[in-house]
């Protein structure tokens, strides 16, 4: 990535076993390769810390990934979440709603959309 404007921030919260990805406004100029690189860094962080919970804040996300990115996410990224031991993934994405279970070779994890970070963190703090 050769951006002068930051495109993301990743934080690890040890006590919560949580890794958080916050997309920043610089995503407007990112490429699909930049997007895939960021997802890889996020997934590797989850693996490194054996994260049980993930949160992705989409409020400032401006990039529109191409269709091949979904294949990459399904085949490369989601198995890393399962390998890390992820149980829940919260999406902060105002206007979206719903929840679902992601099934990948070796495991599953729960997903849910939220309007605010507080709502997402509250859900992540509960047990299944």
Label every model-predicted segment:
Residues 1-128:
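Amphipathic, Lys/Arg-enriched alpha-helical "gate/interface" segment within cytosolic domains
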